[in-house]
Amino acid sequence: MRPEDFEHVLAAAAEATGQDEFVVVGSQAILGSFAQPPEALLQSLEADMYPLRDPASADAIDAALGDGSQFHLAYGYYAHGVGPETAKAPNGWQKRLVRREIPRRVASTRSPVAWCLEVHDLVLSKCVAGRERDWEYAAETLRAGLVGADVLLARVPDLPVAEDLRAHVERMLRTIIASL
């Protein structure tokens, strides 16, 4: 998803929900910290988000902008309405969210704001998900110098998951770091 597509889907979410502030927790949250991240980090066609002040209205995002919606069919990308529990990011992630104002669209009265996971929290939440593409994402952020290995490793103990999963995340990160 290109940065302009991210802005478009956020603006559309504002129109669909009547909300202006959204928390972005998926891979597109990288666009909160970096205007032009490496192309390899922008492969997803989905923006995972929920309205900050009314997370329950995330269903309206799925209905209007979700996978298979008219919006998706028209533009080739879509939004996935999620909830605050979706992000398995290190404790305190809510205090580290990165604010990105989205330009107002023509004929819109909404001024959307994306509150994006801070990049280290984003990478660690993807590591918890643990799919191959998530590990590739983590490796690419390290390779591109977008995250610090020391910060990632320091936040692993703060992940809200079982100890065995935290240990696995740390082992995998150390393996990736050693390979760079």
Regions flagged by a language model, labelled:
Residues 1-180:
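Compositionally biased terminal segments of proteins
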